[in-house]
Swiss-Prot record:
It comes from Streptomyces coelicolor (strain ATCC BAA-471 / A3(2) / M145). It catalyses: N(2)-acetyl-L-ornithine + L-glutamate = N-acetyl-L-glutamate + L-ornithine; L-glutamate + acetyl-CoA = N-acetyl-L-glutamate + CoA + H(+). The record marks A178, T179 as: Cleavage. Heterotetramer of two alpha and two beta chains. Gene3D superfamilies: ArgJ beta chain, C-terminal domain (3.10.20.340), L-amino peptidase D-ALA esterase/amidase (3.60.70.12). GO terms for cellular component: cytoplasm. Pathway: Amino-acid biosynthesis; L-arginine biosynthesis; L-ornithine and N-acetyl-L-glutamate from L-glutamate and N(2)-acetyl-L-ornithine (cyclic): step 1/1; Amino-acid biosynthesis; L-arginine biosynthesis; N(2)-acetyl-L-ornithine from L-glutamate: step 1/4. Substrate binds at T146, K168, T179, E259, N378, S383. It comes from the Bacteria. This is Arginine biosynthesis bifunctional protein ArgJ. It is an enzyme of class 2 (transferase). GO terms for molecular function: glutamate N-acetyltransferase activity; L-glutamate N-acetyltransferase activity. One of its GO terms (biological process) is ornithine biosynthetic process. The record marks T109, G110 as: Involved in the stabilization of negative charge on the oxyanion by the formation of the oxyanion hole.
Amino acid sequence: MSVTAAKGFTAAGITAGIKESGSPDLALVVNTGPRRSAAGVFTSNRVKAAPVLWSEQVLKSGEVTAVVLNSGGANACTGPKGFQDTHATAEKAADVLGTGAGEVAVCSTGLIGVLLPMDKLLPGVEAAAGQLSEHGGEKAAIAIKTTDTVHKTSVVTRDGWTVGGMAKGAGMLAPGLATMLVVITTDADLETEALDRALRAATRVTFDRVDSDGCMSTNDTVLLLSSGSSGVTPEYDAFAEAVRTVCDDLGQQLIRDAEGASKDIKVEVVNAATEDEAVQVGRTIARNNLLKCAIHGEDPNWGRVLSAIGTTDAAFEPDRLNVAINGVWVCKNGGVGEDRELVDMRYREVHIVADLAAGDATATIWTNDLTADYVHENSAYSS
């Protein structure tokens, strides 16, 4: 049920004609209240798409009534006209829903540098409003796909309240956030401050640590909306855990659907001096193309892990480094460890542990292997 699993939300997903393929390309999510609290986090890319600039302003009020999402065009690097088009999209949604444009967030995904076909998008907003349903969450999730092969949803239900979400993303997966559009809804009765705190805490250890290809999008948006319709105000820790669970689930789905990937790689850094250094080392390992190629070839090449670690400024002694691949400590104290022939890499999941022996901090980064399919898909993608 995705974003409509929580009470107080309706959604729709339609084909507006934005995509030449004729696939669904426009989604609408509406908070019917009584509360309309909202929080959001956005790309840290300095080149921000028009809908990101618009939605950042909308979120300053802490209230969102509706979210319009389109696939088939990013509306990024489109100048003043692109921002005007985003404003017009919000105005159209506000008009048909009877609210203000300042309470309508807008999200776009697709090709950068191309204006959206507003003659199709604006009528599409009206058509989507006419199809809003408490059961429309799945259709909305399908409508925001680009190179995704599957739509991505997650739901967690606790004692009298629910958190549900949908996400898109398959390429340009790297922090801040990953290339993603995410809408998370809850019927827990919470104010904006609690939503913002929980969302930022969750994204820091989930979406911000998904790093498939090291490329950062211009359009990343994660929104958390509360309708308050359950009438239940949960303890903050319980709510934050539920939000983190949904974000983690959606983040794992992003990795499993990454463009061209044949291996999902969990890079776990342990015994680092600080968490920041653990993240730095994990990200450096995850972005090492030589290692990603080795994993694709089912080669437990621990030397490439050590080489990657050595390019960081994290605290460690080279002769104390240990590396395990799928449970086999192939590197011990900076040299040869257990027999690499013991490493079973036939399956999709690959787990790398890098032990820095420098402290007690840990961090995990998720990535993929590098394949010919990834190169083909991104060389064939129009630019």
